[in-house]
Every structure is written in C-alpha cells, then in structure tokens.
C-alpha cells in the first residue's frame, strides 16, 4: 500500500458525512460476483484480494479518526449481481435500521431496458433510496474512445439515456462514473436533462496523468461544472497506470475545488476499495489539506463544514441538520417523501 498521512488536528469534534462508500457481508443474502467468484482481470487498482471479505457499518465506524464524528453516510451500489438490485437496497435498508448507517443509498437499475422503471419504483419503497449509479459503456483507454461511440449502452444511445429521464420524473439523482475521456460527452448528454441532479464520482477519474490526459480531464470537468445541477465527490484518485502519490493527488483535489467550488464538492472515501492504496485517515487528511490550501483563514471552518458535512445533506437530501445554515444548504426532514409513488 502507498500512503502518506497528513495530520489534521481539529479544534473541536468535526461532524463528518462520508458521501460514498460500500458495504457487503458476503453471507449469501446478496451476491457479489466480483468479490466471491474469480477475480476481475485488470481491476483498476490492481490486486484486490484484501477487500474480498466483509465490510459493514462497524468496519467503517472504526476507520474514522479521532477528532471526527461520523454522523451520516451515503452507500453506493457495490456491483451486486445485477438481478439483485432490489435485494441490495433492502439489505442496506436493514443495515441502517440496525446500525444507523448509511443515511442514504444509491442503487442500480438497468438503463435501456423495459424493466428500468419498475426497478426504480420498487427500490423507492426504501426510505434510503435517493437515486442510482448506472454506468454507461465506456472505452478502456482515451485512444479507443471511438470504439464505443454510438453503441448500445453508451451516452449516445437514446434508449439508454431514457433512464435519465426516468430519474428526473421521479426526483431521483444520478451518480455519474465515467473516466475522464468521457466527461465532455457526459456534459453534452446532460443538456437534455436540465433538471436532473447529478453527482460525479471520484473526481472524474483522471486516470491518464500525462499532460494531454490531464488537459482533457480539466476540459471535461469544466464542461460538467457549467451545469449547476452537477456536484462532485472528492474521492478515489487511484489510477491503473500511475502510482498513488499523495502530493500529486493533493494537487488534483485543489483543482477540483477550484473548478466546482466548495459548495459543490463532497467528501467521500470510496472505502473499502480506496483502502487498497490509502488509509481512511490519510485520504480525509489529504482532502482537508486541499481545502486549507484553497481557502482563506476566515472561511476555512465554514468551508470544511460544507465539504465534510453540509453538501452531502443538500445533494442527497439527508434527514440531518446542517452546520453552516447557508440558504443553499437544505435538507429533507421527511425521508419517507422518497418512498414509492405512482410514476407520473
């Protein structure tokens, strides 16, 4: 593991919401083929044997360093067997009832199929369900991007993009996860869905750290940031082609904060996956270090409160009180509002 831990000593117990993590019990209730069957070849972080074991709420709580209080979290679908999207949502809802985590769940649905609407509506029975992470077909490298242009399941596929309309109709959000060479394409696709709430995963996945690759990443991030309904998670800067370096990744975090502004950045760990490269404390401290570099002293604490806590409340409409009480920071005090309703 490559890890450099930056030490942050808060003057008080800092409330924290982790806006992206995964749970799995591997006990037969929900199947995870990538964890329980043959390992996936070319996993983007390399050998992942260390996470092929249960990771549940108690494990996440133990990772939070002294000086911080984990007051909520957002669970993101964890590549469960695709026939078990509803089972995963139900299992996560049971975990919250027992362990008080997570505060919200981002599920999955089969975009581009006749079953998508029903899958969304069934999951809306859970008071935790806020939206889905459905991944479009993407190219494996920047050089091969044209190989998927216009193909079924891609961002140019009108049938697949009907899923985005279904989310909008149901007031659900979309967790967007594509590598950097598809960011501008995603920004273009979203122009047809101006009311859709979107949360970009993992800093836009700047896997290609060449000058050309980073230039394309910046262009894509700026294109998405031009849409006021897009936020970004400060999470997962591991790359399949470059070593994990704290200093370089800290610079990328600063760029994300500059492009999107602190109001649209959410702290997120992507644990346990990110734990293959960095400790929880190390990642949290790296995010805080970037915030401190990008913020004047008089605004530092309020900015920390936004990125580490309040922004997750706003973007995922969590039933948790905010800290900064800015007009733009709101929360839904009635989480059952997101329970199943008849589709319009």
Enumerate the language-model features and the residues they cover.
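Histidine-centered catalytic micro-motifs
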Residues: 16-26, 200-203
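Mid-to-C-terminal alpha-helical segments outside catalytic/metal-binding sites
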Residues: 2-19, 28-63, 255, 259-266, ...
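Acidic-and-aromatic substrate-binding clefts and catalytic sites of carbohydrate-active enzymes
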Residues: 51, 79-86, 109-117, 178-184, ...
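Conserved, mostly hydrophobic/aromatic
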Residues: 20, 73, 105, 132, ...
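Catalytic pocket-lining loop regions of alpha/beta-barrel enzymes
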Residues: 150-266
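Active-site gating/metal-coordination segments in enzymes
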Residues: 4, 83-181, 188, 233-238
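A general structural detector for well-ordered alpha-helical segments in enzyme core domains, enriched
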Residues: 59-64, 88-95, 116-123, 159-166, ...
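Active-site gating loops and adjacent loop-to-helix segments of metal-dependent hydrolytic enzymes
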Residues: 25-72, 127-153, 196-197, 228-231, ...
């Amino acid at each position: 593991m490559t890890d450099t831990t930056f030490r942050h000593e808060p003057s008080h117990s800092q409330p924290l919401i982790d806006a992206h993590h995964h749970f799995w019990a591997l006990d037969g209730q929900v199947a995870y083929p990538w964890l329980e069957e043959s390992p996936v070849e070319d996993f983007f972080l390399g050998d992942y044997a260390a996470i092929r074991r249960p990771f549940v709420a108690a494990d996440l709580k133990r990772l939070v360093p002294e000086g911080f209080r984990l007051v909520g979290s957002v669970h993101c679908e964890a590549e469960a067997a695709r026939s078990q999207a509803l089972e995963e949502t139900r299992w996560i809802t049971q975990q919250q009832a027992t362990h008080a985590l997570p505060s919200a769940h981002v599920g999955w649905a089969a975009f581009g199929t006749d079953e998508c609407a029903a899958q969304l509506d069934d999951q809306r029975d859970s008071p935790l369900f806020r939206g889905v992470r459905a991944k479009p077909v993407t190219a494996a490298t920047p050089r091969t991007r044209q190989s998927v242009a216009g193909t079924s399941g891609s961002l140019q596929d009108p049938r697949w993009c009907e899923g985005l309309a279904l989310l909008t109709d149901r007031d659900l959000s979309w967790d967007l996860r594509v590598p950097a060479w598809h960011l501008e394409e995603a920004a273009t696709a979203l122009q047809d869905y101006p009311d859709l709430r979107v949360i970009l995963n993992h800093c836009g996945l700047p896997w290609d750290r060449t000058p050309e690759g980073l230039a394309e990443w910046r262009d894509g991030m700026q294109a998405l940031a031009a849409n006021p309904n897009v936020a970004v998670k400060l999470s997962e800067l591991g790359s399949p082609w470059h070593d994990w370096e704290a200093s370089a990744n800290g610079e990328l975090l600063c760029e994300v904060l500059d492009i999107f502004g602190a109001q649209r950045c959410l702290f997120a760990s992507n644990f346990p996956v990110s734990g293959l490269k960095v400790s929880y404390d190390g990642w949290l401290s790296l995010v805080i270090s970037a915030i401190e570099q990008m913020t004047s002293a008089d605004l530092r604490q309020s900015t920390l409160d936004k990125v580490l806590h309040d922004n997750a409340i706003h973007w995922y409409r969590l039933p948790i009180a905010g800290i900064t009480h800015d007009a733009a920071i709101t929360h839904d005090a009635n989480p059952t509002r997101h329970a199943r309703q008849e589709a319009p």
